[in-house]
């Protein structure tokens, strides 16, 4: 995710919602806005500000050591051959422990299906040689997809987004 490119347009979120036919249910990818700052009038009467806003597009990180997988009592969560963390709906009991344990809040309980749903990495598209729909839909090219070591070598790689939990939680 290249935060400098994200304009908060939510095209990634909507493409995911459409592709997975999610309707108004839990979204697998969400764009969060973080904003703050103040306006103050200086001694000359002019207004000055330190206002800021930025966006973070979040989805399942398909962690190296997923906390959700560790806490799933029904063994409904597993990593596939591509490294995607996936939920087996037939095994999911809907207890929501995985959702409560995930530091990124990726697994979401669906009232309609009565089980956990989450980003599956568009495994079907990846198996066909395509990228995840969110990556391909972003007009600003703020999302990337590939081998972590290749992405980690990018000169603008950021290991941690200030507003999110420390990734060491899911890498040990």
Where in the sequence are the language-model features?
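Non-ligating segments of multi-cofactor redox enzymes
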Residues: 1-172
